Amino acid sequence: MTRTNSDFLTNSDPAIAGLINQELQRQRDHLELIASENFTSAAVLAAQGSVLTNKYAEGLPGKRYYGGCEFIDKIEQIAIDRAKQLFGADHANVQPHSGAQANFAVFLTLLKPGDKIMGMDLSHGGHLTHGSPVNVSGKWFQVCHYGVSQQTEQLDYDQIRELALRERPKLLICGYSAYPRIIDFEKFRSIADEVGAYLLADIAHIAGLVATGLHPNPLPYCDVVTTTTHKTLRGPRGGLILTRDAELGKKLDKSVFPGTQGGPLEHVIAGKAVAFGEALKPEFQGYSAQVIDNARTLANQLQTRGLKLVSDGTDNHLMLVDLRSVNMTGKRADQLVSEVNITANKNTVPFDPQSPFVTSGLRLGSPAMTTRGMGEAEFTEIGNIIADRLLNPDSDTVAQDCKRRVAALCDRFPLYPHLEIPVPVLA
């Protein structure tokens, strides 16, 4: 009988095996609406759980500091080539362990401590690594932040230009963690050129949409592009750096290794290669289009039920529910949907009077449940479930009904039906 990795884990460490199995069951039984999460394919899982985890491979393909990298080199080169093809880049580094690591490598390449960076305020939808005072990017560099218009809750490029002209940053950052609208990278390029700044696009959230042409591609306009490889790209958790400037690419490579990292995680890079290959297939185009259709369907249904959305809708995979109109905090809303097996996250909204630990918003996304096969009909039902729960927060009857409807949806769209980690019954 052939033994699987799961068999070995179960026999070696039933406690960990049992907890992994419980997490698998949680993922199966919940509606996953966290905008930054997705479900990788079984092939990606297999690559990450392979013997590649054993191999040290400091350096780049063909230029390693360790022996025995002949097969590692081929795998990493495939990942590089596929990433370049997917995004239309001339250079790709697939080694960053995360999106944050990718951004740090860019900072090391383009900036010196004390230089000024300009990115979106975290409370308006930016990211920690774009100059938040609690992050190293906000400690090593001077920072100025732009936000969205108070009237439209969308980017105001005239305001951004005025701030850039006043502050003269060395690096201008676009790309966000909670912005539901299209980004005009060409306008950002014009602003960067006017003030003599480098332009970085962090497309961690929208990479899958960019790869399929459903969101404008920043590469023709930006000096450097960074992204994560999960979220809408549906790969393993990791980072990626892209550029069309080959000479700049060499400097970025040195900033990844030895600048900010040691040995790359080759089992994760193999998972990235598999995911990039999947994203190059025609089926991924249909998936990405469905992600947007499902997000718009969910947004429309929430609005139909009387809930307010930041910027009045979405162009991509995510939306922000502004709960101030129903006198509720994001923390309370997160708790309410969690109780009926919906996973989301509280989130600040623009000009939020609440603290980041409380917030006035709830962020929702469509990628994960689209991966499970759900379409507009299911996302209409999801919108109704969320509205029923939030608009009837004190009703146990409504809560039980919502939980039942969540279970019915999950049962119709099974997750990883082939996966099971057998856990022995301990005496």
Swiss-Prot record:
Keywords: Amino-acid biosynthesis, Cytoplasm, One-carbon metabolism, Pyridoxal phosphate, Transferase. The record marks 230 as: Plays an important role in substrate specificity. It catalyses: (6R)-5,10-methylene-5,6,7,8-tetrahydrofolate + glycine + H2O = (6S)-5,6,7,8-tetrahydrofolate + L-serine. Signal peptide: none annotated. Its cofactor is pyridoxal 5'-phosphate. (6S)-5,6,7,8-tetrahydrofolate binds at residues 122, 126-128, 355-357. InterPro entries: PyrdxlP-dep_Trfase, PyrdxlP-dep_Trfase_major, PyrdxlP-dep_Trfase_small, Ser_HO-MeTrfase, Ser_HO-MeTrfase-like, Ser_HO-MeTrfase_PLP_BS, SHMT-like_dom. GO terms for cellular component: cytosol. Its EC number is 2.1.2.1. PROSITE patterns: SHMT (PS00096). The modification N6-(pyridoxal phosphate)lysine is found at residue 231. The keyword DNA repair does not apply. It comes from the Bacteria. GO terms for biological process: glycine biosynthetic process from serine; tetrahydrofolate interconversion. Homodimer. Catalyzes the reversible interconversion of serine and glycine with tetrahydrofolate (THF) serving as the one-carbon carrier. This reaction serves as the major source of one-carbon groups required for the biosynthesis of purines, thymidylate, methionine, and other important biomolecules. Also exhibits THF-independent aldolase activity toward beta-hydroxyamino acids, producing glycine and aldehydes, via a retro-aldol mechanism. This is Serine hydroxymethyltransferase. It comes from Nostoc sp. (strain PCC 7120 / SAG 25.82 / UTEX 2576). The lineage of its organism: Bacteria, Bacillati, Cyanobacteriota, Cyanophyceae, Nostocales.
